Structure formats: C-alpha cells, structure tokens
C-alpha cells in the first residue's frame, strides 16, 4: 500500500472530485489547469486539436478535458462566440516553462496577439499550478480573473469539483458571481 493510501492527509481533497477520482500527480510532477478558448477558424476543432497538442507536450500528460462550452466574447463584443474548455495536466515542467510551451502551441495554431480581447484561433491560459501563487511580469497564477469568468469556472468545476483557488477559496463558491454570464455546454 502506498504512503498516500495509508495517510489520507497526503491526498488533498481539492484534488479529488465527487466520484473519488484523484488528480494528485506522481512524485516529481505537478498539477496544472489550463483554459482553452478559440473563436476563429472552426473553434470547436481548434480546441479539440489543441487538447491533443497539450497531451503531446514534453514532460506533461493530459489527465482530463472538460466538455466544450459556447460563450460570448469578453471585452470586444463585435466578434464570434468562443468555444472554451479546461484541461488538467500533470507536468514536470516548471510553471514558466509550461507557460512557454503553451505559447508555442498557440503559435502552432496561428495565434497572433493583435490587441487585448482580439479574436483568436487559440488562447491557452495557465490557470493553476499546484497550489502555488506566482506573481511575476510573465506569469500570474492563479489566473487573476479566473474566478470572475463562467467560461473558466464551469468547465473547471466539471473536471475538478472540489478545486480550490489559492487565495480565493473553493472555485464553486464563485459560481454565483458569474451566474449572469451565458454559457452553453456543447459536448464532451
């Protein structure tokens, strides 16, 4: 029997969903949650293909992918709706290296950073990395607005219902704050 099985305190409840499935990474690995979004060039296909690309990242393993969701754009409204999902990864990459790998995937999918809230072929955001709080010029984890966005919270809670946002508490506690944001589940 593993040390974790002998000592329930070593399996944090924030990593266990209601079905009892454990997202705790193996020793030497980290748990990261990544938001996926697209609203150009067949966005459903873009998000599905991007999830495949996440599964092929060096030193990383895709553990879970939420259903796809349709949401209205944030900021600049005169653009197509977004297709969104959230993925759980186990990774041996440090957070900054994982962020660089996500940027590389975005570039593979033709992402251009023209202006804030611009339409995009693919957007990948590192939401959470273990329970770390990182505030650097290149990376803020937890993502600073994740608790205010239905397109992040709803798919995140689908794959990790007990998830905690460091410094903010249970992700589920923020659902009332986003209840006015339209979100439509499309498929698994």
Stretch-by-stretch model annotation:
Residues 64-65, 185:
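A structural preference for short, hydrophobic beta-strand core positions in alpha/beta folds
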Residues 4-60, 66-70:
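N-terminal beta1-alpha1 ligand-phosphate binding loop
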Residues 37, 90-92:
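Solvent-exposed residues in well-ordered beta-strands and their adjoining turns
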Residues 2-21, 59, 73-83, 93-188:
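Flexible, gly/pro- and Lys/Arg-enriched active-site loops
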């Amino acid at each position: 029997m593993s040390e974790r099985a002998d000592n329930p305190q070593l399996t944090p409840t924030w990593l266990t969903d209601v079905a009892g499935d454990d997202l705790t990474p193996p020793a030497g690995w980290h748990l990261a949650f990544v938001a996926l979004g697209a609203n150009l060039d067949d966005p459903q296909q873009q998000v599905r293909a991007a999830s495949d690309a996440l599964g092929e990242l060096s030193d990383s393993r895709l553990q879970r992918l939420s259903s796809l969701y349709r949401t209205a754009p944030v900021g600049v409204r005169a653009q197509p709706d977004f297709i969104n999902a959230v993925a759980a990864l186990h990774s041996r990459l440090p957070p900054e290296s994982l962020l660089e790998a996500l940027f590389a995937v975005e570039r593979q999918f033709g992402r251009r950073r023209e202006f804030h809230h611009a339409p995009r072929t693919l957007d990948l955001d590192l939401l959470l990395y273990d329970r770390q709080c990182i505030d650097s010029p290149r990376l803020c984890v937890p993502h600073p607005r994740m608790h205010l966005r239905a397109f992040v919270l709803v798919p995140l809670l689908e794959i990790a219902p007990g998830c905690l946002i460091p410094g903010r508490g249970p992700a589920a506690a923020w659902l009332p704050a986003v209840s006015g944001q339209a979100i439509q589940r499309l498929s698994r």
